[in-house]
């Protein structure tokens, strides 16, 4: 057990040391709120930072539980964020992302009960993200995104979110 722990620690250290400069790789976590439908969304992302932009991938999960509809949606996709402003403590990024995923929904009413529906969903997101650096490796951000999700119960959404970025 001790050997496994030492080996795991060594592998983590090697992964961090492989970064060419501080901030070359990142992991972020976001808790979002879809304003149009009062829906919560969780996002986990990772990627690489370049001089003027970030390239990464996101995994999203959202749960909609309303009187007439109950739906769960999981999406993944690439993300490109461009630094519109980049300072020592504050950055402003423009975001473009693609999404592809799966939605499972159940629609119901007092008169009609419909079976579960499953759908392949795809779409895009555009947005803006101000980011504040707390230390060389940790940043907090707020975010606004407009999302168009085809084949979904909810096609277009306005999202706001708060999150944290850890630079490796």
Where are the language model's segments positioned?
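Transmembrane beta-barrel strands of outer-membrane/channel proteins
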Residues: 29-33, 44-48, 57-61, 78, ...
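Cleavable N-terminal export/targeting peptides
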Residues: 1-24
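Solvent-exposed loop/turn segments connecting transmembrane beta-strands
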Residues: 29-43, 65-71, 88, 148-157
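Flexible, solvent-exposed loop segments that connect beta-strands
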Residues: 24, 55-74, 100-122, 153, ...
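Outer-membrane beta-barrel "beta-signal"
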Residues: 156-168
């Amino acid at each position: 057990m001790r050997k496994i722990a030492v080996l795991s620690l060594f592998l983590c250290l090697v992964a961090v040391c492989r970064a060419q400069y501080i901030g070359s790789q990142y992991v972020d976590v976001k808790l979002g709120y879809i304003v149009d439908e009062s829906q919560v969304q969780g996002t986990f992302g990772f990627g690489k930072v370049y001089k003027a932009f970030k390239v990464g991938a996101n995994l999203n999960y959202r749960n909609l539980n309303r009187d007439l509809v109950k739906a769960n949606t999981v999406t993944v996709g690439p993300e490109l964020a461009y630094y519109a402003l980049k300072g020592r403590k504050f950055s402003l990024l423009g975001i473009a992302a693609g999404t592809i995923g799966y939605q499972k929904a159940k629609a119901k009413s007092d008169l009609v009960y419909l079976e579960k529906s499953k759908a392949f969903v795809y779409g895009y997101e555009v947005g803006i993200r101000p980011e504040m650096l707390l230390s060389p490796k940790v940043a907090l951000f707020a975010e606004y995104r407009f999302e168009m999700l085809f084949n979904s119960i909810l096609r277009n959404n306005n999202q706001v979110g708060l999150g944290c970025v850890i630079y490796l």
